[in-house]
Amino acid sequence: MEAIFKRRSIRKYTNQELSDEIIEKILKAGMAAPSAQNEQPWHFVIIKDKNILREIPKFHPYSKMLPGAGCAIVVCGDTSLARGDKWPQDCSAATQNMLLMATEAGIGSVWLGIYPDKDRIEPLKELLNLPACIIPFSIVSLGYPAETREPNDRYDASRVHINKWENL
């Protein structure tokens, strides 16, 4: 529970490299996510190459932190593995698990949306040489935090409805 409430979007990182063990731990958390009919329609592209990380902000306006990140992981949906249209939910669950594991491991992270924005999908597919059946869903930027952000309580009782919709 601590990681859930402590997790914050971190966009500034130190120069310390992430170990392969930490990256694997984060990937294992992503792959532990629930998926519809247990299809697990995901693939993950680890980006450590600074030249590639510098290209992404040219087409993704909210990814300016990537050149300073230790690495990024692109969460992709594989339409050849998905029997239906639930792969975005599955990739969302995988992305969230990765953010929580990063927090638990002391790594800063931020979720960068790709899908369904074609102006982000197509350039990223080209940059990473992704096959036609692979759709980039999100990018998780990772690095040792060079900033701190305090957790906040987002619970809002006015958004809770019991049995049917009523204003509380």
Task: Indicate residue ranges for each PLM-predicted region.
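Acidic, surface-exposed loops and disordered segments
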Residues: 1-168
